[in-house]
């Protein structure tokens, strides 16, 4: 079980300096592209930027299968609070494009590393990330993504709702 793995738990414990709790996981079987985004507006810790996610390769991810990518240093950009007048949630793609343009980051600065089966790429909720388009009819991108918080943190949803996440 990936989520109960001692190794994953130890890594998350090092990030948080306390025991982690996983609040969401998703299984991806297909090769659909995912636009670049920050997780923070959808889910985060009460301490914005603390949520840590992991992308687990369930097979060797070939370059033409549409690899997972991150934009290095994007977690250091000033985050804008979701407000009624900015409506970042409904216009997230526009917001990300503007954020990249306003910063020193270039869209071509993305990193889509080779990952073999069992490799995990970690990022925090402020890191801009996504999945590239697939150019293969035969290679897939089977993976699991999980999102974790420090065990005593509250789960913040849409930057406005706290959700109780009990643990044992």
What positions do the PLM features span?
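Acidic, metal-coordinating catalytic segment for phosphate/diphosphate chemistry
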Residues: 38
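Non-heme Fe(II)/2-oxoglutarate
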Residues: 1-4, 33-34, 80-85, 91, 117-122, 126-168
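Double-stranded beta-helix
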Residues: 63-128
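Short, conserved beta-strand element in jelly-roll/cupin
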Residues: 44-63, 114-117, 122, 147-151
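Signature of the catalytic double-stranded beta-helix
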Residues: 1-25, 47, 58
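Short, conserved phosphate-binding/catalytic loop or strand-edge motifs used
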Residues: 28-32
């Amino acid at each position: 079980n990936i989520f109960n793995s001692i190794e994953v738990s130890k890594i998350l414990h090092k990030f948080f300096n306390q025991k982690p709790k996983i609040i969401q996981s998703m299984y991806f079987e297909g090769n659909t592209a995912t636009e670049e985004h920050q997780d923070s507006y959808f889910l985060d810790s009460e301490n914005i930027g603390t949520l840590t996610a992991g992308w687990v390769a369930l097979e060797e991810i070939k370059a033409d299968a549409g690899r997972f990518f991150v934009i290095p240093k994007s977690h250091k950009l000033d985050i804008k609070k979701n407000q009624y007048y900015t409506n970042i949630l409904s216009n997230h793609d526009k917001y990300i494009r503007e954020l990249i343009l306003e910063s020193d980051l270039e869209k071509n600065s993305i990193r889509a590393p080779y990952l073999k089966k069992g490799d995990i790429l970690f990022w925090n909720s402020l890191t801009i990330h996504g999945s590239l388009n697939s150019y293969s009819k035969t290679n897939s991108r089977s993976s699991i993504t999980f999102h974790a918080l420090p065990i005593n943190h509250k789960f913040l949803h849409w930057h406005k709702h706290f959700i109780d996440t009990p643990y044992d």
